[in-house]
């Protein structure tokens, strides 16, 4: 049969509690399979001349049974009857294939590890979250790819999935009794999972989750919620798992000017997008109107994502927004993000602290007041032994550098500007307080950009390019 017409492997779940499983082999290959089998409460007999250390410890604890000896045809033939599954897990392919042939002759499912051809079943890469089981298989064609896929899936699975699954399991009979109609029951579960009830269950707040579920069963509409989420400095790979989860579950998203398209692509595709355009003093939507819009949408039952660059509580006006939500009685969550100072500095190769020259780091905003002046703690800023990270400081960069020199820092004090930090088109300019404004102007540096001031700039590390062919 050609690869194009081969139907492949049929996935199914098998209950192994108390079932006898024979494993031939006592080394590292066998260990990986025995670990999985023990997690599913199988009764394991191992045929091998000797056991590696972990297997030997499990044998001493009575968790497995060891039949000492080589995998001769007679020994294998005597051991296999009555077993539910067989694993041929030695480091000798010929031995594994001989074991597989004997198991096949007895109609016992057998897996010759890393050798699909003689196997009647294979063991996929697995993810466990309580009652939830996810299996990923490439049909034995590419086990490393299956493991990589498992890692990616695990990365986006919410941490509370186990608690959610157990809650649903516990409430299933209650929902069936309260809602006999299958179609309506399915809609109740969908609304529960997509709303605050599912979120509460994931957090282990079962009383709150049960209250939401009972409201849905009674025909009530669930209330909305606002999520203030920090999206990090720009690279989508720097999103937290929690941020990504909420981005993919929001009904609507209010987002700012500086979020790159690659990051916005991670938002649920059918979510309504509302651009509020906050950038310095140019606002598509004033802050009071943003607050009102968040409240309006939440009261309409929406799960509203307020997506902000960096961290919502570091120069992001997140504090003002949650005060408005609290006053209106709107439930909310805050998800921190990697702030620009740490993200951009790391990608630029500039440490924020250094034992030799910077024992502290000061975050300030370069956003001028309405009259154009900078209201900053200049005496605290113009000190050696620290790093200054200046947010939104490009426009006021000449004044910032002038004032730092006026308050005591030397003109040749190191400084840098990181434009579009963490993104593919990131630029880093290094200089001094005396020449950085001219450098930034000559290179037409724009927002978003972060200014770093301090001796740490001289410790910048530039990552070398990868070697050819790697």
UniProtKB/Swiss-Prot annotation:
GO biological process per UniProt: cobalamin biosynthetic process; methylation; siroheme biosynthetic process
Record-annotated active site: 256 (proton acceptor), 278 (proton donor)
Pathway(s) per entry: Cofactor biosynthesis; adenosylcobalamin biosynthesis; precorrin-2 from uroporphyrinogen III: step 1/1; Cofactor biosynthesis; adenosylcobalamin biosynthesis; sirohydrochlorin from precorrin-2: step 1/1; Porphyrin-containing compound metabolism; siroheme biosynthesis; precorrin-2 from uroporphyrinogen III: step 1/1; Porphyrin-containing compound metabolism; siroheme biosynthesis; siroheme from sirohydrochlorin: step 1/1
Precorrin-2 dehydrogenase /sirohydrochlorin ferrochelatase as annotated region, ranges: 1-213
GO MF term set: NAD binding; precorrin-2 dehydrogenase activity; sirohydrochlorin ferrochelatase activity; uroporphyrin-III C-methyltransferase activity
Region (Uroporphyrinogen-III C-methyltransferase): 224-470
Binding site for NAD(+): 28-29, 49-50
Keywords: Cobalamin biosynthesis, Lyase, Methyltransferase, Multifunctional enzyme, NAD, Oxidoreductase, Porphyrin biosynthesis, S-adenosyl-L-methionine, Transferase
Entry's transmembrane regions: none
Pfam families: CysG_dimeriser, NAD_binding_7, Sirohm_synth_M, TP_methylase
EC identifiers of the protein: 2.1.1.107, 1.3.1.76, 4.99.1.4
HAMAP family in the cross-refs: Siroheme_synth (MF_01646)
NCBIfam families reported for this sequence: cobA_cysG_Cterm, cysG_Nterm, PRK06136.1, PRK10637.1
Purpose of the protein: Then it catalyzes the NAD-dependent ring dehydrogenation of precorrin-2 to yield sirohydrochlorin. Finally, it catalyzes the ferrochelation of sirohydrochlorin to yield siroheme.
Entry's family note: In the N-terminal section; belongs to the precorrin-2 dehydrogenase / sirohydrochlorin ferrochelatase family. In the C-terminal section; belongs to the precorrin methyltransferase family.
Protein name (database record): Siroheme synthase
